Amino acid sequence: MNTTSDTLRVGFIGLGSQGGPMARRIIEAGYPVTLWARRPGTLEPFADTAAKSAGSPAELAAASDLICVCVRDDADTEEVVDAVLGGLAAGGVIAVHSTVHPDTCRRLAERAQARGVRLIDAPVSGGAPAAEAGRLLVMAGGDEETVEFCRPVFASYGDPIVYLGPVGAGQIAKLLNNAAFTAHLGVAVSLLALGRSLGVDQLRLADVISHGSGNSFALERVASAGGTLARIGEHAGHLLRKDVRLIADLAATAPAGAEGGASEPGDAGHGHGEHGATLLAAADAALALMNVGR
């Protein structure tokens, strides 16, 4: 087992639109990389690289010191982590880049610890273009020394890399980010529709707002999609719904009057406990516009 980050052997599972560019950046940074995918065709884009392929997650684990997992949801994450724990040597590290419930990461971290393996959560934000440019936001939770151990690998595709606290803290930050993005999508659609009804050209209004204090990443996405959420909902609605459901579940368990947190007026009447009602109401409105209500 290598113990210094500059000699790390990296395994990567989850080579989709987000994970694929991340894996390529690690390879281009010079790390020895092993890949695994359920479908052999997923590995074809890496034929021009020095990456090796494994026949199973356990085989990948046996050839790795750090394993990055970037799969779709909680069930896939649990399945992959359980599989790699069968081959990863004590002292190895698993970084969960998937966006999942914090409790999923906490549970998996306990299983890993029982085998002498360290697990951190490190969800990312920014999409494929940011990954390709090495500008993904990485939100890390877990043992801080372990996060620092992984930082040079994360830096091949991420900047900034933010340490947030214990295992699960990264997921909480990512889910809040995604809930805010969902809410902003709905606000952007409403803003552009109101502007049209008042006689202002939609594209010119979007250009103005993009240079003002009301700008948001969501506004850019909505404007480029013609001022509606139809296309965004078709491609990402189910994932946004998943994340809003997860943060709503967390909000329902947030202790009343948590230290440092101010209650929102009328929260209790929104069914979201004392915290997060305004955020979740706006996110729910956006999901409804995408026809994927929570």
Spans of model-derived segments:
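NAD(P)+-binding Rossmann beta1-loop-alpha1 motif at the extreme N-terminus of oxidoreductases
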Residues: 1-69
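Rossmann-fold dinucleotide-binding core
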Residues: 10, 99-176
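Hydrophobic residues within alpha-helices
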Residues: 22-26, 108, 194
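Hydrophobic beta-strand scaffold residues
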Residues: 33, 53, 118-120, 161, ...
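Rossmann-fold NAD(P) dinucleotide-binding segment
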Residues: 57-118
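Helical "substrate-binding/catalytic lid" subdomain
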Residues: 169-294
